[in-house]
Amino acid sequence: MAIIIGSDEAGKRLKEVIKSYLLDNKYDVVDVTEGQEVDFVDATLAVAKDVQSQEGNLGIVIDAFGTGSFMVATKIKGMIAAEVSDERSGYMTRGHNNSRMITMGSEIVGDTLAKNVVKGFVEGKYDGGRHQIRVDMLNKMC
């Protein structure tokens, strides 16, 4: 499993904080926007492409508010994403929604909160069962 990460200019500093946190915790991290100045649309598309390239990959995109990246991610066939700004949502979106990507806003969450959100997301496991009905419904929409 790799954690694919990317950001636009507004999210670059927080992306580096999250990337360092993940690397310190021995995760395989791929930064698809490293050294680039990209729009949140391009950052989200690049992360989603790599997430979908291998089962088990997860994605994190950071822009100013998280909303733009979320809107892009939800337009991609087969992608279930969540805009998160709290630890519980980061964890629960994996367990109940089988989300493979989260988006966050660098102007919404601080460093410590962002690390805690990411921790919940990457450590969360999909519960399946009754939640699979909803996941199937979401996947039929695209």
UniProtKB/Swiss-Prot annotation:
Pfam families: LacAB_rpiB. It comes from the Bacteria. Pathway: Carbohydrate metabolism; D-galactose 6-phosphate degradation; D-tagatose 6-phosphate from D-galactose 6-phosphate: step 1/1. GO terms for molecular function: galactose-6-phosphate isomerase activity; ribose-5-phosphate isomerase activity. GO terms for biological process: D-allose catabolic process; galactose catabolic process; lactose catabolic process via tagatose-6-phosphate; pentose-phosphate shunt, non-oxidative branch. Keywords: Isomerase, Lactose metabolism. Transmembrane segments: none annotated. It catalyses: aldehydo-D-galactose 6-phosphate = keto-D-tagatose 6-phosphate. Disulfide bonds: none annotated. Its EC number is 5.3.1.26. Belongs to the LacAB/RpiB family. HAMAP family: LacA. NCBIfam families: lacA (TIGR01118), PRK08621.1 (NF006380), rpiB_lacA_lacB (TIGR00689). Heteromultimeric protein consisting of LacA and LacB. This is Galactose-6-phosphate isomerase subunit LacA. The gene is lacA.
